[in-house]
Amino acid sequence: MKSIILFVLSLLLILEKQAAVMGQKGGSKGQLSSGSSRFPHRHRSQHYSGQKDKQHTESKGSFSIQHTYHVDANDHDRTRKSQQYYLNAQHKTTKSKQHLRRRQRLLNYKQKGRGRVKPKRHFHLIVIHRKGGQVHHGTQNPSQDQGNSPSGKGIFRQYSNTEKRLWVHGLSKEQASASGAQKGRTQGGSQSSYVLQTEELVVNKQQLETKNSHQNKGHYQNVVDVREEHSGKLQTSLHPAHQDRLQHGPKDIFTTQDELLVYNKNQHQTKNLNQDQEHGQKAHKISYQSSRTEERQLNHGEKSVQKDVSKGSISIQTEEKIHGKSQNQVTIPSQDQEHGHKENKISYQSSSAEERRLNSGEKGIQKGVXKGSISIQTEEKIYGKSQNQVTIPSQDQEHGHKENKISYQSSSAEERRLNSGEKGIQKGVXKGSISIQTEEKIYGKSQNQVTIPSQDQEHGHKENKISYQSSSTEQRQLNYGRKSIQKDVIQSSLSFQTEKLVEGKSQIQTPNPNQGQWSGQNAKGNSGKSADGEQDLLSHEQEGRYQQEFSGAHNTVNIEHEVAYDDLLTQQYNEDRNPIST
């Protein structure tokens, strides 16, 4: 390119010198001075516009050259020199035509291709003013040939067309607005890009679907589908076109910001959704998390039934209050049965948090976190007279075989505060056992009773499988002076506790907790024998002792009741000669 430009400049300087010499010789003869008035002169001008490569134009900048040639056609003595001059000019014009055609191709390619052609404020001009008429001896007019050439005019028109376009801040002439949307489109040839800016108000449940698609040579590269259902105000804002400058290249880059704002009465919810979902055939990971928090407030005359279904456990709490008289019924069938075989590991976890507030003068807070165990606390208040009933059949049965590992852990923490002048705090941490404490306040008379039916049965044999099922159904109806009816159907464990309060007199009834003990040797089971004990009625100032001894078993349960005004109840359990005091 540099060599061509230098060659053209050198030729123009030579021609200018020759024209100056010819002008001086013609002026000495007085032909040029008189010829200006005698002969009609034709002034033709041709505009050449060319463009260098983008790199060269940026490095050197634009330039403009203007040359004026004065030719006298009536000078017959200088025909040879003029003929040679025009032959050289014709040769030069042919090269300039080729050069300009090449430039036109480059311009068309850049406009259609990936590059962007910026219009130049300064054009490359070569102006030839021809003076005189026709040239003899068959010489052709180079200016006429160049005037008829489509290359120079085509480029000039092309510049005028590009100058008409709007390349400011990435905006084009085509702008459309529909439903509050502004669409800016920038064309760079075969590539096109779209920028959307939408703001809509959604009152009810509607679906908003926005697709930003970019087409590159007939292939869709980026397709974004957004489908959201909201009730409230939804606002989707994208950057407008004058803020983002789209660059065309082998890869197209989109910058998108999505903000979803949902307003629904008293709820302020902001969601930023970004999902990268990878589906593979190997190494799948699925995680589930669940948390429950329940808070209940009970008033007079309300009934509430709560059912929590977790893994292997069902807890139901029913509370009824009739005319200030409270009846509580708790029925809990709980089974943790695990059958393990060779090299099997099974672990269960369940967590529950409950907070209850009773408006009849007593407040109870119970928080139980247990694995495979259930803790229950019931409170009743009838005209200042309290009745507590706790019935918990619980079995933790472990069947271990060869190389089996099963671990159970249960922890419970209970804290109760009664407004009738008495506070009780119990914290029990045990494995496979359930600890319950009930407190009663009757006109300054306290009665405490603890009943723990707990069985930890482990059966380890070879190739033996033993399954246990326990189901309990309790139905109690307590009135002010009536008796209580209790029906319990339990397999492998029974625990009963009934309490009656009649006009300030305390009656405590404790039936027999049955224990079914299984011992198997080589797939043979022997069932133990149980004997029922006695039932004692205790008044509010008497002392009673109730002892039960079981035949065919190694367990001994000793229960002592002491009823006084401010005395505490002491209970002792001896299981397999291991004392446990609460």
Swiss-Prot record:
Complex and partners: Interacts with SERPINA5.
Keyword presence, Transmembrane: no
Ranges for region Disordered: 25-62, 131-156, 173-192, 272-477, 502-554
Pfam family, one: Semenogelin
Residue ranges with Polar residues bias: 137-151, 174-192, 325-335, 385-395, 445-455, 466-477, 506-529
GO cellular component terms, semicolon-separated: extracellular exosome
Lineage: Eukaryota, Metazoa, Chordata, Craniata, Vertebrata
Amino acid composition bias (Basic and acidic residues), ranges on this chain: 50-59, 292-310, 336-345, 396-405, 456-465, 537-546
Annotated InterPro entries: Semenogelin
GO biological process annotation, one example: negative regulation of flagellated sperm motility
Family membership: Belongs to the semenogelin family.
Protein's recorded name: Semenogelin-2
Keywords: Repeat, Secreted, Signal
UniProt subcellular location: Secreted
Signal sequence extent: 1-23
Keyword Signal: yes
Functional summary from the UniProt entry: Participates in the formation of a gel matrix (sperm coagulum) entrapping the accessory gland secretions and ejaculated spermatozoa.
Principal subcellular localisation of the protein: secreted
